[in-house]
Every structure is written in structure tokens, then in C-alpha cells.
């Protein structure tokens, strides 16, 4: 709430100062005119990823929820190493070596940071699902300007 400060001089946790100046605010307001087009483009990318990856053993996808309007800014997949045949980290490196940059979101977990590591609440026994997901999730490249060829390259890295 106060940028990680407990008092005027004591920082107890990482924090962020998310204030924005007028120029960036004005730019953001101008960009809002194009947000619907960008979301629709990302939705097309998400549909193609979903269509191509839905039957791949060991790849688990989030489904769109009825009544929720997604902005498609991320496309996470979950890797079941046993079924897929390789770990998330192995796939990440394979993709990176081919010039395809996914992101290992939620990794490392904040609970493993030195600030939190010693807390009882941060232990693996207390957060089993968080630790499991942190080792399995990778977000595929997602941008409104991804070309069809780019999307097919990403898919190819996962399927081959």
C-alpha cells in the first residue's frame, strides 16, 4: 500500500511507484482509440493457438469463461511433463534457441524471494498449487501485430 515501506525509512517488501506523468497519460488516452482492434487481433491469435494445441498431449489450456470479456493480453499454457515428454523449462529453452520467446510467468514465485522465503506462509507445503503451477506455466508470444507466420512458428515449436 505504501510502496513497501513500513515507516519513513524501513522497507519491508518490494514495492512499486506506479504514478504516471501527463505525457504518458495523454499517450494512453490516445491509444485507447485503438484498443478494440488490438484486442480483436489478439483474440484471433488466441483462437489459432487454441485450435492448434487443444489436442496436444500434456498441453493444458485455459478456456474462455462465459460472461467474461477477455483482453487476450496473455496466452498461458500448462505443461504436464510426463504426458508432453519434456518440461516447461526444456520447452522454454527450445523455443528461445529458435528465436521464439515465451515467458515463464509466476516464476520464480514471490514466496521464494529473500523477503518472504523465511515466512511460514511461503513454504512449499503451504502453497503446493502455486509451486506446481510456477514450474508448469509458460505464456506464448502474444501481440496484436503477430503475423500468421509468427503464430505458426510458435505452434511449430510446441508441436514438433
Give, region by region, the residue ranges found by the protein language model.
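PLP-dependent aminotransferase class I/II
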Residues: 1-160
